[in-house]
């Protein structure tokens, strides 16, 4: 069976861009078990509570829910286990330096397959305040209304 080419998105963290100001993004590989890969290929994953932390100078992703593979037996994985992210040392150093600054965190944005390999897009982000979230929603609503008015004007 030939490897797939291109990018197949499995899961996205839609709340991440709502709750955080995204500064930098990185692409990282993930150390997964076989049943996790099979479950991901079926499109099963949830990134709602996902976050990344450093342990022993390595970046780990937590809170991601990959359900057990339905045809797996006793070899199945734990659904909410910690998963190691695979990055170059210089990227890890840059990320850890940014995290040491106050207010920055690392959040996963997207989980996908790229040329047959599972990847995750992570971002260095700063948390939004409540008034920032309301302002963003207001801007999006104004943009939608202006597009709607423009569409109605063009119909006439």
From Swiss-Prot:
Required for rescue of stalled ribosomes mediated by trans-translation. Binds to transfer-messenger RNA (tmRNA), required for stable association of tmRNA with ribosomes. tmRNA and SmpB together mimic tRNA shape, replacing the anticodon stem-loop with SmpB. tmRNA is encoded by the ssrA gene; the 2 termini fold to resemble tRNA(Ala) and it encodes a 'tag peptide', a short internal open reading frame. During trans-translation Ala-aminoacylated tmRNA acts like a tRNA, entering the A-site of stalled ribosomes, displacing the stalled mRNA. It comes from Paenarthrobacter aurescens (strain TC1). It is found in: Cytoplasm. InterPro entries: SmpB, SsrA-bd_prot, SsrA-bd_prot_CS. Residues 134-156 are annotated as: Disordered. This is SsrA-binding protein. Its main location: cytoplasm. It holds the Pfam family SmpB. One of its GO terms (cellular component) is cytosol. Gene3D superfamilies: 2.40.280.10. The gene is smpB. One of its GO terms (biological process) is trans-translation. Belongs to the SmpB family. GO terms for molecular function: RNA binding. The keyword RNA-binding applies. PANTHER family: SSRA-BINDING PROTEIN (PTHR30308:SF2), TMRNA-BINDING COMPONENT OF TRANS-TRANSLATION TAGGING COMPLEX (PTHR30308). CDD domains: SmpB (cd09294). Keywords: Cytoplasm, RNA-binding.
């Amino acid at each position: 069976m030939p490897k797939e080419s291109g990018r197949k998105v499995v899961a996205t963290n839609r709340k991440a861009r709502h709750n955080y100001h995204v500064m930098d993004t990185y692409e990282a590989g993930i150390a997964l078990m076989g049943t996790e890969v099979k479950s991901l290929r079926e499109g099963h994953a949830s990134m709602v509570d996902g976050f990344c932390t450093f342990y022993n100078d390595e970046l780990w992703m937590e809170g991601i829910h990959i359900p057990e593979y339905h045809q797996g037996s006793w070899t199945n994985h734990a659904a909410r286990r910690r998963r190691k992210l695979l990055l170059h040392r210089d990227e890890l150093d840059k990320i850890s330096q940014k995290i040491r600054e106050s207010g920055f965190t690392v959040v996963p944005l997207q989980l996908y397959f790229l040329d047959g390999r599972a990847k995750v897009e992570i971002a260095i982000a700063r948390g939004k305040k409540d008034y920032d979230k309301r302002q963003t929603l207001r801007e999006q609503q104004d943009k939608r209304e202006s597009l709607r008015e423009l569409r109605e004007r063009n119909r006439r």
